[in-house]
């Protein structure tokens, strides 16, 4: 299902030196290969160990690497696909860069009191082996991979990848849970039909999801939408389906805590999927993306949105549209890594103090 670089740590007797040994593979993931579902997976992030940061090989938050979701409550999964991009490419490199920027993340969330690693079994499952030459085949591969993950009860947290990937993920999620609620945070509504004569690309995932009955349309909220358009009412389709559309200008200079209180009430206990495109944020904070739009959300508002989902029945999350070639400082990927950690902290069963 997932193509991984099989690896192991070897410690020389009495030397204290840890040697990285790897066999052939397609993806260079993280620290240690977790081959069983023992209590060792109930752990703080390995970033708490005594090794200095540059010594370790990169996985999300230095989590153990597993080739199977069996026994996990949640897992980080990379989908390095950008062949659905309409403007600037590069999101295929997003998972790798986000993992790199996650290495300094801690194990608890002092702001919310969340203790994810004391509550859940979590690992990094590596990357889905997409087909960069065939978008339709990539969608099939993603859908099948996520069906296997979800069938075990594991909640996937996805590192994208362009927003096309949300469509096959939602196909798998809906097969497991039925139509789901959606909190979509992004600059674009992504409800186009086929403006480029193709029904599947990063501007169409939620249109296709409605077509296939994957969403509970009365429980879909889109936040941060903005930008110029070729029509005066570019959000007509979303609103006609019952989506709540919260424009970026309605968020300017405001706390979004009251908005999220309304959304929590709207969602109730239904299964909820969170899809966060990094272009929701103003490009002053997140320049490394394929289709930036000015006057976006702030990082603190992004935190309010994700933290506002804590306690809801979250069944999956993604963070998409990070394009490292346009992220010279690494700040965009750093934001993405932190937002994924916040998503982990917002999952069901995560205890707080």
Curated annotation (Swiss-Prot):
Keywords from the UniProt entry: Acetylation, Arginine metabolism, Hydrolase, Manganese, Metal-binding, Mitochondrion, Transit peptide
InterPro entries referenced in this protein's UniProt entry, alphabetically: Agmatinase-rel, Ureohydrolase, Ureohydrolase_dom_sf
Role played: Hydrolyzes linear guanidino acids to form urea and the corresponding amines. Displays specificity for substrates having a negatively charged head group and short chains including taurocyamine, guanidino propanoic and butanoic acids. May protect cells by detoxifying potentially harmful amounts of guanidino acids. Metabolizes L-arginine with low efficiency.
Recorded metabolic or biological pathway in which this protein acts: Nitrogen metabolism; urea cycle; L-ornithine and urea from L-arginine: step 1/1
Gene designation: Agmat
The EC number(s) this enzyme carries: 3.5.3.-, 3.5.3.1, 3.5.3.7, 3.5.3.17
Chain positions found as N6-succinyllysine: 218
Cofactor section: Mn(2+)
Binding locations of Mn(2+) 2: 188, 279
Domain of life of the organism encoding this protein: Eukaryota
Family: Belongs to the arginase family. Agmatinase subfamily.
Modified residues (N6-acetyllysine): 194, 218
KW Manganese (keyword) present: yes
Protein name: Guanidino acid hydrolase, mitochondrial
Main location per the UniProt record: mitochondrion
Lineage per the UniProt record: Eukaryota, Metazoa, Chordata, Craniata, Vertebrata
Record's GO cellular component terms: mitochondrion
Record Pfam families: Arginase
UniProt region (Disordered), positions on chain: 29-52
Compartment(s) of residence: Mitochondrion
Organism this protein belongs to: Rattus norvegicus (Rat)
GO-annotated biological processes: putrescine biosynthetic process from arginine, via agmatine; urea cycle
GO MF annotation terms: agmatinase activity; arginase activity; guanidinobutyrase activity; guanidinopropionase activity; metal ion binding
Reaction it catalyzes: 3-guanidinopropanoate + H2O = urea + beta-alanine; 4-guanidinobutanoate + H2O = urea + 4-aminobutanoate; taurocyamine + H2O = urea + taurine; L-arginine + H2O = urea + L-ornithine
């Amino acid at each position: 299902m997932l193509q991984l670089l099989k690896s192991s740590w070897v410690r020389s007797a009495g030397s204290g030196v840890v040697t990285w040994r790897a066999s052939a593979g397609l993806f260079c993931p993280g620290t240690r290969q977790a081959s069983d579902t023992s209590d060792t997976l109930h752990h703080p992030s390995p970033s708490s160990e005594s090794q200095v940061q540059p010594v370790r090989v990169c996985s999300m938050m230095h989590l153990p690497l597993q080739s199977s979701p069996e026994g996990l409550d949640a897992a980080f999964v990379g989908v390095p696909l950008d062949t659905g991009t309409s403007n600037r490419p590069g999101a295929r490199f997003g998972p790798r860069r986000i993992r790199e920027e996650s290495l300094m993340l801690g194990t608890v969330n002092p702001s919310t009191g969340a203790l994810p690693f004391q509550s859940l079994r979590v690992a990094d499952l590596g990357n889905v082996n997409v087909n960069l030459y065939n978008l339709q085949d990539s969608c099939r591969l993603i859908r099948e991979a996520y069906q296997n993950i979800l069938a075990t009860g594991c909640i996937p947290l996805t590192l994208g990848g362009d927003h096309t990937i949300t469509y096959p993920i939602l196909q798998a999620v809906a097969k497991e849970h039925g139509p789901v609620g959606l909190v979509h945070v992004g600059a674009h509504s992504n409800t186009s039909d086929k403006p480029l004569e193709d029904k599947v690309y990063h501007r169409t995932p939620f249109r296709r999801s409605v077509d296939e009955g994957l969403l509970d349309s009365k429980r879909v909220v889109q936040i941060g939408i903005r930008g110029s358009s070729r029509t005066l009412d570019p959000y007509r389709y979303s609103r006609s389906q019952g989506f709540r559309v919260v424009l970026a200008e309605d968020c300017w200079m405001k706390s979004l805590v009251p908005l999220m209180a309304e959304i929590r009430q709207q969602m109730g206990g239904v299964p909820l999927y969170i899809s966060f495109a990094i272009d929701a944020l103003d490009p002053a904070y997140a320049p490394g993306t394929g289709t930036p739009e000015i006057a976006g959300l702030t990082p603190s508002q992004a935190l309010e949105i994700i933290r506002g989902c804590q306690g809801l029945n979250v069944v999956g999350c993604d963070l998409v549209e990070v394009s490292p070639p346009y992220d010279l400082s690494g700040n965009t990927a750093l934001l993405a890594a932190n937002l994924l950690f916040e998503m982990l902290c917002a999952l069901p069963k995560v205890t707080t103090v």
